[in-house]
Amino acid sequence: MLFQENIKFQVTNFNASVVCQFDENWERIRKSIEVAFELLKKWGFNDSSFRAKNAVIPIVYYIYSKAIENDILKDRLYQEDKKLMRKWVCISLLKGVFGGHSDSVLTTIKKVLSDKEIKVFPYEKIKLAFASDDAKSLTLSDEFIDDVLKTQKDSSNCYAVLALLYSHLHYDTVSYHKDHLHPASHFLKLKPSDFADINTYNFYTNPENWNSVLNLQLLSANSNESKNDEELKSWVESNNIDLESRLIPKNINLEFSDFPVFIRERKELLTRILKSAIGE
């Protein structure tokens, strides 16, 4: 992808000229690859949550072509680039952009990245390049968003969803964990006799409500340990939590007894945030 137009993984593409260019530039190439994966690590991705390794190739290409491999990891530099790179990673994972025909996907992206006029990582131009391809489109339909918000905590996609929602966090300097807002332990011990009717019991015990993105947040490692199984209302009040930054609905009762209202309101809130995050 770095040194020729045909990026297919074929023996014929590794001619003497390409091999020579790799040899001459190997230290910069290696450094670009290393810092790209270090960025993913800083953003909280691991081998489980970052399944489509091809998604890092455009980032490596951009870092190398802009010659920023020695500075991109510095906290105060290239903040907009890193924000857009992280957005690309999250949405490309959720949409399964590299689920098939990865060569054609990378060829399209290379055409965008080859533009010498780009000033920051060109997420919007990449999105536009796939706008007419339903299979690779980076847009999120209402139906898709509904499904995304049902993503379970242990799903490989869960971290990508939360990282997209919590795009305002300081990923370069803080490590974040997935955390239940209303503690999971409260739901696991419920019995039908705890409720006036079976429908309410079914709502509380449905994993699509209590164990999905609708009841999850990204919390710093230290805060997550201290929060433990504390009631949501108590945690918010005792720690003077900023509801807006935590993506918690305002002007509702956060008691466990009002969990259905919490889920309804948070679904509306997260839907708006997702649409805003992707520019729709």
Regions found by a protein language model. Name each.
Residues 1-134:
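A cross-family structural signal marking well-folded subdomains
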Residues 22, 29, 33, 52-55, ...:
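Active-site-proximal structural scaffolding
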Residues 57, 83, 87, 176-179, ...:
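Feature representing long, continuous alpha-helical segments
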Residues 90-181, 186, 190-194:
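Intrinsically disordered, low-complexity N-proximal targeting/linker segments that flank membranes
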Residues 172, 205-206, 279-280:
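Extended, charge-rich low-complexity regions and/or helical-solenoid scaffolds
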Residues 176, 188-225:
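Short beta-strand-alpha-helix junction that forms the catalytic/metal-binding core
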Residues 209-210, 227-250:
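Polybasic, low-complexity binding patches
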Residues 244-280:
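C-terminal, well-folded lobe of enzymatic/effector domains
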